[in-house]
Amino acid sequence: MAIKSFQGKRIVKKRSSSNRLLVSDIMSYKLVLFTPDESIHDVMKKFIKFRVSGGPVVNSYGKLVGIISEADCMKEISDSRYFNMPILDKTVKHFMTNNVQTIDVSTSVFDAASLFFKTKKRRFPVINKDKLVGQISRKDIVIAALNMKSQTWR
């Protein structure tokens, strides 16, 4: 009888769902928030000051009501020049995106990456029980992928 292997029986650990890398593990918790009544001029100042290209818009109760981005501001700048109107008196509520797509904190990083790929969006607000708790960006996903070990690619 020949020896087939010098190794013993291979034991493969079954991965539990708790080992999955989740959005909550890599998202940003410190956010630059905007309000619907904030002026576009103030928003652009915040973009420069905090080096962000957009962020969530919340009402006085802290509920997510929209997203404002540099692209929204570019539209206002373009329109103001075309109509020869100042941009100082316009507010976020006139230019923000109202129907906001969100990601739940319990979503896996891979599902989030797939959503980023399908939608071409740069960031998503992260929700836990209908409450805004953070934000995840494409950059967060890329950083997480670079830090993963081969065993976590599931």
Where are these predicted regions, by residue range?
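Tandem CBS (Cystathionine beta-synthase) repeat/Bateman regulatory domains
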Residues: 1-154
